[in-house]
């Protein structure tokens, strides 16, 4: 689909101490109706190199560089599952009515997708950072704290019941998600000889997102509420262990269609928790059981040894605060 945009940028630096940058974007997409086609997305950044101030000179031997920076900006997206012309209804041929006993029918056309007068999904991003260098730039530290507020996220309507007759639920700008976190990088370089240098470094980052609005209808039990949880959270039943006897199976809630032919729990099967106490394990007993497979924490460390034109290095990386759902036979 077609897009059109204008962009402008202005930068200013005074005496390598004070910095300012502004970015302006005006973008349009044919995905949206004419009255919502264009969006304005500004951003700006400020910086202050404190170590370049005259009164900092006495500290240069210890803190050779100190800069504080802040950025704040708005970005937008028009990506709605790859569909063009979101604001227009789409029609397709459908099965017609049947008449008599000869399977005669009259074909017709019906709605396959409903138009939605959606607009740009926007995200406000803020970042506060500090750059530090110590001992004649041998040791450097970078810290960033960030926050993001996404709103008007494209989601299909969920409060509309199935019996309303919609073939497909329409899209709307209703989703809201918050994200926050921080990043840190530390690096140290030491000269070991005339042409020999050793550098060691490490990094750490943490982020956490939270669903603010997802258009879900009111839930029957509090553990079913997805607002306030992370986007990639894993939902399911709580495993209490394994069945150890037939008596335990008989005393436990019925699981997954028990009572029907071929549906019965056996000794050694997983026993799930009946959260609402109704004697049946079903969707009303599902809750948040995991953080999902997108890590909240990333970390790494490494080292480089340079001797003349020859260098060798090593890097170790890892992540945490994530889980995987393993399937298959044990």
Language-model features and meaning:
Residues 1-238, 305:
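Extracellular/periplasmic, surface-exposed regions of secreted and cell-surface proteins
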Residues 101-111, 149-174, 209-294, 302, ...:
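Surface-exposed, extracytoplasmic segments of Gram-negative outer-membrane nutrient-acquisition systems
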